[in-house]
Every structure is written in structure tokens, then in C-alpha cells.
Regions:
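Helix-to-loop junction immediately C-terminal to a conserved catalytic motif
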Residues: 51
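A short, proline-enriched helix->beta-strand linker immediately N-terminal to the Walker B motif
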Residues: 155-159
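Short coil-to-helix segment of the ABC ATPase nucleotide-binding domain corresponding to the Q-loop/switch region
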Residues: 96-104
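Catalytic Walker B motif of ABC-type/P-loop ATPase nucleotide-binding domains
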Residues: 161-164
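Conserved ABC transporter NBD signature motif
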Residues: 59-67
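Conserved ABC ATPase signature
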Residues: 136-140, 144-146
Length: 233
């Protein structure tokens, strides 16, 4: 079974806009996949379907053996415990330190303090933040803030890491460092990575699988691909 298995999926919003149209897509465990396309093509809707922010109008969306389409709202937490999500906006809690931001989710899950410390320190080590654990978000750079977000996303060792424009607010040099870190996590932890991006240079340099959407339709799916999206619209 594929880790992500989407079949004949449609997402039509109440205003009649079709964001995803007859999408069939399979992603193996441990793959690194870029999702590309012009603004409004359905990229963000696709990843929202994966973490059940949206439900498909029609079709199947399976993530780690869970049928997202049939998942009751009260059971969404079971899916999200298998996921880590990194957004363009850092969404860090300003009054908490780096350590506390990464630990916050585990504390809410009722994880024992000794285990929290072990997991948090491991995540901070992976992301190169051990020297920043006592800092507050406003005391570190944008790139470091995004590293905190990545540490927070991987602290529970998720099977899937979803990155929605993770370099959108960063300069080119820092963007490359962040993607290099995500690639390292993919290789070392075996985490499946699905990354939405507009960054042509990063996509072209990575030579990973590239999926392109246009008006909600899959128009390209290439292993070791390059950025082919037409952003003229």
C-alpha cells in the first residue's frame, strides 16, 4: 500500500470553484515530493486534504492507512499525530522560548516530562538549535524561527512532513539552507515529505519528484524533475 493514495479526488467549494479535479496520485513512504503550480492551481487545497483541513467532495484520500474522506471530526487528531506541518508563516508563540515552543504540543498530548525533554532535545539537535533553546522568537532570525517550526513539526517523529511554502518569507540563501535541512530529515528519519513551493531554483537543484497542478488538474508528474509550472496567470 502507498503511504499517500489519492484516487479520482475532487474538491468543489460551495461557491462552485473546483480546486481539485479528478486527481489520482500515489506517494511512497519515504519519498520527497515537490508540489508546484501557479497561484490558485490547487496546491494548498491538496495539502489541506492530506491533513484533513478540507474534506474531498468526491473520491478517496488515504494517508498512512487512514481514509481521510471518511474521518469523523472527532478522530482527526489521530491522523495529525502522524503528521508534521510547516507553514510559510512561523506561527510561533512569542512568549515561549525555543524549547517551550517545540515542547508545547507534546505537553498538550500528556507526554511525560522526561520523554518530552528527550524528544525536544533530539529535534533541536537535528535542526541545529541547541544553542538557541532559551531564546524567544523575537531574539532569533527568520531562518532560525523556521528551524524552530521544523523542530516542532518533527518532535513526535511523524511519518509525513507537509511543508506549505516553507521558504516563502526567507531570502534565497536561507531558503536553500532550510530545504537542505528538510532533505536531511527525509533521508535520516525516513520521513515522507510533501513540499509546496514556487521556488524554481530550489526545485531544479534538488532533482526530486515534481508534481505540477493547473486549475486543479495534474499536468506533470516527473521523477528527478524540474519546475515546469506556468505562472503567467
Amino acid at each position: 500500500m502507498k503511504f499517500i493514495d489519492i484516487r479520482n479526488c475532487y474538491k468543489v467549494y460551495k461557491n462552485g470553484v473546483t480546486a481539485i479535479a479528478d486527481l489520482t496520485l500515489a506517494i511512497d513512504k519515504g519519498e520527497f515530493v515537490f508540489i508546484t503550480g501557479a497561484s490558485g492551481c490547487g496546491k494548498s487545497t491538496l495539502v489541506k486534504l492530506l491533513y484533513r483541513e478540507e474534506k474531498p467532495t468526491k473520491g478517496q484520500v488515504m494517508v498512512g492507512g487512514i481514509n481521510v474522506a471518511k474521518l469523523y471530526n472527532s478522530r482527526v487528531y489521530k491522523l495529525r499525530r502522524k503528521l508534521g506541518i510547516v507553514f510559510q508563516d512561523f506561527k510561533l508563540l512569542p512568549k515561549l522560548t525555543v524549547y517551550e515552543n517545540v515542547a508545547f504540543g507534546l505537553e498538550n498530548l500528556g507526554v511525560k516530562s522526561k520523554e518530552i525533554k528527550r524528544k525536544v532535545m533530539k529535534a533541536l539537535e537535528r535542526t541545529g538549535l541547541l544553542e538557541k533553546i532559551k531564546c524567544f522568537p523575537n531574539e532569533i532570525s527568520g531562518g532560525e524561527q523556521q528551524r524552530v517550526c521544523i523542530a516542532r513539526a518533527i518532535v513526535n517523529e511523524p511519518k509525513l512532513l507537509i511543508c506549505d511554502e516553507p521558504t516563502g518569507n526567507l531570502d534565497p540563501k536561507t531558503s536553500k539552507e532550510i530545504v537542505k535541512l528538510i532533505s536531511k530529515i527525509n533521508k535520516e528519519m525516513g520521513t515522507t515529505v510533501v513540499m509546496v513551493t514556487h521556488d524554481k531554483e530550489i526545485v531544479n537543484s534538488m532533482k526530486r519528484r515534481v508534481i505540477t497542478l493547473e486549475n486543479g488538474v495534474l499536468t506533470n508528474d516527473t521523477m528527478k524533475g524540474s519546475y515546469t509550472a506556468d505562472e503567467s496567470d
